Amino acid sequence: YTLLCYKTPIPINAETCPPGENLCYTKMWCDIWCSSRGKVVELGCAATCPSKKPYEEVTCCSTDKCNPHPKQRPD
């Protein structure tokens, strides 16, 4: 079984993760355009949940397409 995760960059597509990568992750942080464009969002597959830097938000999940882009989620 291989997991389906959304991956950036845009266009954001759900892709099959490589064997051994059984988590989807969402990583968000602010860059210099944060006030006008919002947070930078990185989506992808991982074998282990990426470690979080102090300025980042990282969430991981383990079901197909469980990491949609925050702006694409219904409110």
Swiss-Prot record:
Signal peptide location: 1-2
GO cellular component: extracellular region
Keyword annotations of the record: Acetylcholine receptor inhibiting toxin, Disulfide bond, Ion channel impairing toxin, Neurotoxin, Postsynaptic neurotoxin, Secreted, Signal, Toxin
Disulphide linkage map: C5-C24, C17-C45, C30-C34, C49-C60, C61-C66
Taxonomy, superkingdom: Eukaryota
Gene Ontology MF terms: acetylcholine receptor inhibitor activity; ion channel regulator activity; toxin activity
Family assignment from sequence similarity: Belongs to the three-finger toxin family. Long-chain subfamily. Type II alpha-neurotoxin sub-subfamily.
Protein name per UniProt: Alpha-elapitoxin-Bc2b
UniProt source species: Bungarus candidus
